[in-house]
Amino acid sequence: MDPPLPSLHSPQWASLLQLHHGLMWLRRFAVLVRVYALVVFHIAISTAFCGMIWLGIPDSHNICQHESSPLLLVFAPSLLWCLVLIQGERHPDDVVLTMGYVGLLSVTTVFYTWCSDLPAILIDYTLVLTLWIACTGAVMVGDSFRAKRWELICSRVLTSVFFITLWVIGDQTVFHHQRILLYGYGAIVFLMMTVTFYGTRYIRDELPAAQTLRGSLLIYVGLVTMFKITLIVLSPNLWRLPWTTVFAAFRSSYCEGGGGS
Protein backbone atom coordinates (compact mmCIF):
# COMPACT_ATOMS: atom_id res chain seq x y z
CA MET A 1 0.00 0.00 0.00
CA ASP A 2 1.38 3.43 -1.02
CA PRO A 3 2.26 5.82 1.80
CA PRO A 4 -0.13 8.78 2.17
CA LEU A 5 0.84 12.05 0.53
CA PRO A 6 1.85 14.84 2.90
CA SER A 7 -0.71 17.50 3.70
CA LEU A 8 -0.57 20.79 1.77
CA HIS A 9 0.13 22.56 5.05
CA SER A 10 2.82 20.16 6.16
CA PRO A 11 6.50 21.17 6.48
CA GLN A 12 7.37 18.71 3.69
CA TRP A 13 5.19 20.57 1.16
CA ALA A 14 6.59 23.90 2.29
CA SER A 15 10.14 22.62 1.80
CA LEU A 16 9.32 21.21 -1.64
CA LEU A 17 7.64 24.45 -2.69
CA GLN A 18 10.58 26.50 -1.49
CA LEU A 19 12.99 24.22 -3.36
CA HIS A 20 10.89 24.50 -6.52
CA HIS A 21 10.86 28.29 -6.31
CA GLY A 22 14.60 28.33 -5.71
CA LEU A 23 15.27 26.18 -8.78
CA MET A 24 13.01 28.35 -10.93
CA TRP A 25 14.78 31.48 -9.68
CA LEU A 26 18.18 29.97 -10.53
CA ARG A 27 17.01 29.13 -14.05
CA ARG A 28 15.71 32.66 -14.64
CA PHE A 29 18.83 34.16 -13.08
CA ALA A 30 21.03 32.17 -15.46
CA VAL A 31 19.03 33.52 -18.42
CA LEU A 32 19.34 37.09 -17.09
CA VAL A 33 23.10 36.74 -16.65
CA ARG A 34 23.50 35.57 -20.25
CA VAL A 35 21.25 38.30 -21.65
CA TYR A 36 22.88 41.19 -19.80
CA ALA A 37 26.39 39.85 -20.41
CA LEU A 38 25.57 39.95 -24.13
CA VAL A 39 24.19 43.49 -23.81
CA VAL A 40 27.39 44.67 -22.11
CA PHE A 41 29.40 42.93 -24.84
CA HIS A 42 27.38 44.66 -27.59
CA ILE A 43 27.79 48.06 -25.91
CA ALA A 44 31.53 47.52 -25.45
CA ILE A 45 31.98 46.64 -29.14
CA SER A 46 29.99 49.67 -30.31
CA THR A 47 31.73 52.04 -27.88
CA ALA A 48 35.22 50.86 -28.84
CA PHE A 49 34.48 50.95 -32.58
CA CYS A 50 32.77 54.35 -32.53
CA GLY A 51 35.44 55.83 -30.24
CA MET A 52 38.31 54.74 -32.47
CA ILE A 53 36.67 55.95 -35.68
CA TRP A 54 35.37 59.21 -34.18
CA LEU A 55 38.73 60.16 -32.67
CA GLY A 56 40.76 58.72 -35.54
CA ILE A 57 39.10 60.76 -38.30
CA PRO A 58 38.68 64.25 -36.82
CA ASP A 59 38.36 65.89 -40.25
CA SER A 60 34.97 64.24 -40.76
CA HIS A 61 33.29 65.89 -37.76
CA ASN A 62 32.01 68.80 -39.87
CA ILE A 63 30.51 66.60 -42.57
CA CYS A 64 26.95 67.59 -41.68
CA GLN A 65 27.60 71.24 -42.50
CA HIS A 66 27.72 70.22 -46.17
CA GLU A 67 25.79 66.94 -46.12
CA SER A 68 22.80 66.42 -43.79
CA SER A 69 21.95 62.87 -44.86
CA PRO A 70 23.65 61.25 -41.78
CA LEU A 71 20.74 62.64 -39.73
CA LEU A 72 18.45 60.17 -41.49
CA LEU A 73 20.34 57.38 -39.72
CA VAL A 74 18.32 58.18 -36.59
CA PHE A 75 15.64 55.91 -38.06
CA ALA A 76 17.93 52.87 -38.50
CA PRO A 77 17.75 51.53 -34.92
CA SER A 78 14.04 52.38 -34.70
CA LEU A 79 13.28 50.18 -37.71
CA LEU A 80 15.41 47.32 -36.36
CA TRP A 81 13.81 47.67 -32.93
CA CYS A 82 10.31 47.45 -34.43
CA LEU A 83 11.42 44.41 -36.45
CA VAL A 84 12.66 42.57 -33.35
CA LEU A 85 9.52 43.50 -31.38
CA ILE A 86 7.03 42.56 -34.11
CA GLN A 87 8.62 39.22 -34.96
CA GLY A 88 8.77 38.21 -31.31
CA GLU A 89 9.82 34.62 -30.78
CA ARG A 90 9.83 34.08 -34.56
CA HIS A 91 12.94 36.27 -34.78
CA PRO A 92 16.02 34.06 -35.41
CA ASP A 93 18.29 33.65 -32.39
CA ASP A 94 21.43 33.60 -34.52
CA VAL A 95 24.96 34.78 -33.62
CA VAL A 96 25.78 35.98 -37.15
CA LEU A 97 22.54 37.97 -37.40
CA THR A 98 23.10 39.47 -33.94
CA MET A 99 26.63 40.59 -34.80
CA GLY A 100 25.28 41.97 -38.07
CA TYR A 101 22.85 44.13 -36.06
CA VAL A 102 25.67 45.30 -33.79
CA GLY A 103 27.97 46.07 -36.73
CA LEU A 104 25.28 47.93 -38.68
CA LEU A 105 24.22 50.06 -35.72
CA SER A 106 27.85 50.79 -34.80
CA VAL A 107 28.60 52.08 -38.32
CA THR A 108 25.42 54.18 -38.49
CA THR A 109 26.13 55.59 -35.03
CA VAL A 110 29.61 56.73 -36.11
CA PHE A 111 28.21 58.65 -39.09
CA TYR A 112 25.41 60.06 -36.96
CA THR A 113 27.72 61.32 -34.19
CA TRP A 114 29.84 63.15 -36.75
CA CYS A 115 27.02 65.71 -36.76
CA SER A 116 27.55 66.51 -33.05
CA ASP A 117 30.41 67.30 -30.68
CA LEU A 118 32.20 65.26 -28.01
CA PRO A 119 30.66 66.88 -24.87
CA ALA A 120 27.11 66.26 -26.12
CA ILE A 121 27.99 62.67 -27.05
CA LEU A 122 29.46 61.93 -23.61
CA ILE A 123 26.48 63.51 -21.80
CA ASP A 124 24.10 61.56 -24.02
CA TYR A 125 25.96 58.29 -23.40
CA THR A 126 25.87 58.81 -19.62
CA LEU A 127 22.21 59.89 -19.56
CA VAL A 128 20.94 56.97 -21.65
CA LEU A 129 22.87 54.40 -19.61
CA THR A 130 21.54 55.98 -16.40
CA LEU A 131 17.94 55.83 -17.62
CA TRP A 132 18.39 52.22 -18.72
CA ILE A 133 19.95 51.18 -15.40
CA ALA A 134 17.13 52.95 -13.53
CA CYS A 135 14.42 51.20 -15.58
CA THR A 136 16.13 47.84 -15.26
CA GLY A 137 16.75 48.32 -11.55
CA ALA A 138 13.09 49.19 -10.96
CA VAL A 139 12.10 45.85 -12.45
CA MET A 140 14.83 43.83 -10.77
CA VAL A 141 13.94 45.10 -7.27
CA GLY A 142 11.02 42.66 -7.24
CA ASP A 143 11.25 39.11 -8.52
CA SER A 144 8.63 36.88 -10.09
CA PHE A 145 7.64 35.32 -6.75
CA ARG A 146 6.95 38.53 -4.84
CA ALA A 147 4.36 41.27 -5.21
CA LYS A 148 5.04 43.92 -7.85
CA ARG A 149 4.71 46.68 -5.25
CA TRP A 150 8.34 47.81 -5.53
CA GLU A 151 8.15 47.86 -9.31
CA LEU A 152 5.13 50.15 -9.16
CA ILE A 153 6.75 52.48 -6.62
CA CYS A 154 10.07 52.70 -8.49
CA SER A 155 8.43 53.24 -11.88
CA ARG A 156 6.21 56.06 -10.55
CA VAL A 157 9.10 57.79 -8.80
CA LEU A 158 11.29 57.50 -11.90
CA THR A 159 8.51 58.81 -14.16
CA SER A 160 7.77 61.74 -11.83
CA VAL A 161 11.43 62.78 -11.62
CA PHE A 162 11.81 62.52 -15.40
CA PHE A 163 8.79 64.68 -16.23
CA ILE A 164 9.50 67.26 -13.51
CA THR A 165 13.04 67.66 -14.86
CA LEU A 166 11.70 67.93 -18.41
CA TRP A 167 9.13 70.55 -17.35
CA VAL A 168 11.77 72.66 -15.55
CA ILE A 169 14.09 72.58 -18.57
CA GLY A 170 11.23 73.33 -20.96
CA ASP A 171 10.02 76.24 -18.84
CA GLN A 172 13.45 77.85 -19.17
CA THR A 173 13.56 77.37 -22.93
CA VAL A 174 13.18 80.64 -24.82
CA PHE A 175 12.13 79.52 -28.29
CA HIS A 176 8.79 77.86 -28.92
CA HIS A 177 10.12 75.31 -31.43
CA GLN A 178 12.77 74.22 -28.93
CA ARG A 179 10.09 73.65 -26.29
CA ILE A 180 8.05 71.58 -28.76
CA LEU A 181 11.15 69.55 -29.64
CA LEU A 182 11.93 68.97 -25.96
CA TYR A 183 8.40 67.85 -25.08
CA GLY A 184 8.25 65.65 -28.16
CA TYR A 185 11.51 64.07 -27.09
CA GLY A 186 10.08 63.53 -23.60
CA ALA A 187 7.04 61.72 -25.01
CA ILE A 188 9.21 59.46 -27.19
CA VAL A 189 11.64 58.63 -24.39
CA PHE A 190 8.78 57.96 -21.96
CA LEU A 191 7.29 55.53 -24.48
CA MET A 192 10.65 53.81 -24.88
CA MET A 193 11.19 53.68 -21.12
CA THR A 194 7.78 52.01 -20.78
CA VAL A 195 8.68 49.45 -23.43
CA THR A 196 12.06 48.93 -21.73
CA PHE A 197 10.33 48.47 -18.37
CA TYR A 198 7.91 45.81 -19.58
CA GLY A 199 10.51 44.30 -21.91
CA THR A 200 12.82 43.81 -18.93
CA ARG A 201 9.99 42.18 -17.00
CA TYR A 202 9.38 39.86 -19.97
CA ILE A 203 13.09 38.95 -20.10
CA ARG A 204 13.11 38.38 -16.35
CA ASP A 205 10.00 36.19 -16.18
CA GLU A 206 9.19 34.69 -19.59
CA LEU A 207 12.07 34.84 -22.09
CA PRO A 208 12.91 31.28 -23.25
CA ALA A 209 16.43 30.17 -22.40
CA ALA A 210 17.07 29.53 -26.11
CA GLN A 211 16.24 33.17 -27.00
CA THR A 212 18.95 35.02 -25.06
CA LEU A 213 20.41 36.62 -28.20
CA ARG A 214 17.02 38.06 -29.14
CA GLY A 215 16.57 39.32 -25.58
CA SER A 216 19.93 41.08 -25.70
CA LEU A 217 19.04 42.63 -29.06
CA LEU A 218 15.79 44.04 -27.64
CA ILE A 219 17.76 45.91 -25.00
CA TYR A 220 20.73 46.91 -27.17
CA VAL A 221 18.72 48.24 -30.12
CA GLY A 222 16.46 50.15 -27.73
CA LEU A 223 19.51 51.76 -26.12
CA VAL A 224 20.92 52.86 -29.48
CA THR A 225 17.53 54.31 -30.41
CA MET A 226 17.39 56.33 -27.19
CA PHE A 227 21.00 57.46 -27.72
CA LYS A 228 20.33 58.84 -31.20
CA ILE A 229 17.09 60.59 -30.26
CA THR A 230 18.64 62.15 -27.16
CA LEU A 231 21.63 63.41 -29.15
CA ILE A 232 19.30 65.58 -31.24
CA VAL A 233 18.08 67.37 -28.11
CA LEU A 234 21.60 67.80 -26.71
CA SER A 235 23.04 69.15 -29.98
CA PRO A 236 21.47 72.54 -30.86
CA ASN A 237 23.59 72.70 -34.00
CA LEU A 238 21.52 69.83 -35.41
CA TRP A 239 18.35 71.93 -35.18
CA ARG A 240 19.81 74.51 -37.56
CA LEU A 241 21.13 72.14 -40.21
CA PRO A 242 19.49 72.83 -43.59
CA TRP A 243 17.55 69.85 -44.89
CA THR A 244 18.25 71.09 -48.41
CA THR A 245 21.74 69.58 -48.08
CA VAL A 246 20.39 66.02 -47.71
CA PHE A 247 22.16 63.90 -50.35
CA ALA A 248 23.86 67.07 -51.58
CA ALA A 249 27.02 65.21 -52.61
CA PHE A 250 25.00 62.63 -54.55
CA ARG A 251 22.89 65.29 -56.27
CA SER A 252 25.93 67.38 -57.22
CA SER A 253 27.77 64.39 -58.68
CA TYR A 254 24.60 63.37 -60.55
CA CYS A 255 24.19 66.86 -61.97
CA GLU A 256 27.83 67.00 -63.00
CA GLY A 257 27.53 63.61 -64.67
CA GLY A 258 24.36 64.69 -66.43
CA GLY A 259 25.92 67.97 -67.49
CA GLY A 260 29.00 66.22 -68.82
CA SER A 261 26.94 63.89 -70.94
Curated annotation (Swiss-Prot):
UniProt key word Membrane: yes
Q: Which keywords fit this entry according to its UniProt record?
A: Host membrane, Membrane, Transmembrane, Transmembrane helix
Q: Does the keyword Transmembrane apply?
A: yes
Entry's localization field = Host membrane
Q: What is its main location?
A: host cell
Topology in the membrane? Multi-pass membrane protein
Give the stretches traversing the membrane: 37-57, 68-88, 95-115, 121-141, 150-170, 180-200, 215-235
Any one GO cellular component localisation term in the record: membrane
Protein name listed in UniProt: Membrane protein US13
**Species name for this entry?**
Human cytomegalovirus (strain Merlin)
GN (gene name): US13
